[in-house]
Amino acid sequence: MMDVNSSGRPDLYGHLRSLILPEVGRGLQDLSPDGGAHPVVSSWMPHLLSGFLEVTASPAPTWDAPPDNVSGCGEQINYGRVEKVVIGSILTLITLLTIAGNCLVVISVCFVKKLRQPSNYLIVSLALADLSVAVAVMPFVSVTDLIGGKWIFGHFFCNVFIAMDVMCCTASIMTLCVISIDRYLGITRPLTYPVRQNGKCMAKMILSVWLLSASITLPPLFGWAQNVNDDKVCLISQDFGYTIYSTAVAFYIPMSVMLFMYYQIYKAARKSAAKHKFPGFPRVQPESVISLNGVVKLQKEVEECANLSRLLKHERKNISIFKREQKAATTLGIIVGAFTVCWLPFFLLSTARPFICGTSCSCIPLWVERTCLWLGYANSLINPFIYAFFNRDLRTTYRSLLQCQYRNINRKLSAAGMHEALKLAERPERSEFVLQNSDHCGKKGHDT
């Protein structure tokens, strides 16, 4: 029967030694001519075999189950001084730019009258969520990363930090999802959707986004799935059920909705492009009506001039709709693309981690986790600049605020809007046609 050591585990080394040493001794006696072992061999052979068995039996601790805090839990990286300066500068720059960009959005919409419309309330909600990430989350992650990954802010604040991180990031993602739905309805239902697009409706949508984001935050605080938190680690709960629920609600469902909305807008833009080819209008020819009665001829030409005016208005409307659809498709495509590139690696890692490492800790290399996390945070940085790039009013307001030109911002926006409307009203290739036919109609009207 195998011996058991003081820890209650089988004494593998002692068992092997008791079996092998007597057999080796008898073998040596058989090899000796006089039936006895050589004195030198008898003296060193047991020690040699003992050393061999100690080496070969040294993996015996594999009988022990690995502790819960091994395989990456509490992993730390010791950065040099230069590395700390470089990493700290990059993380600080990301944080400050995120704060500045989202503050510009909030100030622009709240203080510029033309921008205070219900459709922009969603952009303000997005900016507030991204601003919360920059103020309440990024600084603590930056400090933790600079000291090598060790959590130093205590057990209580770990739960508060995770709650803020999850809620703000989820609110940002879900607001992007609602914005995509808003853009889709604005394009596909231009006549009916603006009626429902009022302040109360937008307020309810924004409130729903934040409540749903909070629903992901609350379970670990009320005992469903405890966060991983000790002296070194502050990690969101790795419970299988909670991981699937939180990642699905916070990312996979919103991403699916955004992709579907983008596809629908893209399809509408292509359909509009095929429909509105604008082949041109027939010219008004004085000789087109031949009649012996001059009154009938004049009446026909007046009707053609009236038809020309209606056709011009219809073409301008079609051009406006077409350009709006194309702009919405381009904007939403860039938003969805940036969102996917920033957040997809992090959520794939978060979903797979419990199944790879178990529920007690993380075995993923720290640098991989932090890279994916900061890539997701970068989405909060680029959102304000994406909207400013495609929104002329926001772009003009940004420029005025950065140049400290606070007066007459609304007047500048109105003038820029009128200039853009006049610019898009008539395409250059139709200007000659419009002038020729307008002169002809004006001449006929003067002759009457």
UniProtKB/Swiss-Prot annotation:
Membrane topology annotation: Multi-pass membrane protein
Bridged cysteine pairs (disulfide): 158-234
Family that this chain belongs to: Belongs to the G-protein coupled receptor 1 family.
Residues spanning the membrane: 87-111, 122-143, 156-181, 202-222, 241-263, 330-355, 367-390
Gene Ontology CC entries for this record: axon terminus; dendrite; neuronal cell body; plasma membrane; postsynaptic membrane; presynaptic membrane; synaptic vesicle
Location in or out of the cell: Cell membrane
Domain of life: Eukaryota
InterPro entries per record: 5HT_7_rcpt, GPCR_Rhodpsn, GPCR_Rhodpsn_7TM
UniProt gene name: Htr7
Record lineage: Eukaryota, Metazoa, Chordata, Craniata, Vertebrata
Keywords associated with the record: Cell membrane, Disulfide bond, G-protein coupled receptor, Glycoprotein, Lipoprotein, Membrane, Palmitate, Receptor, Transducer, Transmembrane, Transmembrane helix
Keyword Cell membrane: yes
Comment block on domains: Specificity for G(s) G alpha proteins is determined by the length of transmembrane regions 5 and 6 (TM5 and TM6).
Binding site for serotonin: 165
Gene Ontology molecular function: G protein-coupled serotonin receptor activity; neurotransmitter receptor activity; serotonin receptor activity
Biological process annotations from GO: adenylate cyclase-activating serotonin receptor signaling pathway; behavioral response to pain; chemical synaptic transmission; circadian rhythm; detection of mechanical stimulus involved in sensory perception of pain; dopaminergic neuron differentiation; G protein-coupled receptor signaling pathway, coupled to cyclic nucleotide second messenger; long-term synaptic potentiation
Glycosylation-annotated residues: 5, 69
Protein name: 5-hydroxytryptamine receptor 7
Known tissue expression: Thalamus, hypothalamus, and the hippocampal rudiments.
Function: G-protein coupled receptor for 5-hydroxytryptamine (serotonin), a biogenic hormone that functions as a neurotransmitter, a hormone and a mitogen. Ligand binding causes a conformation change that triggers signaling via guanine nucleotide-binding proteins (G proteins) and modulates the activity of downstream effectors. HTR7 is coupled to G(s) G alpha proteins and mediates activation of adenylate cyclase activity.
Intervals, Extracellular compartment: 1-86, 144-155, 223-240, 356-366
Membrane topology (Cytoplasmic): 112-121, 182-201, 264-329, 391-448
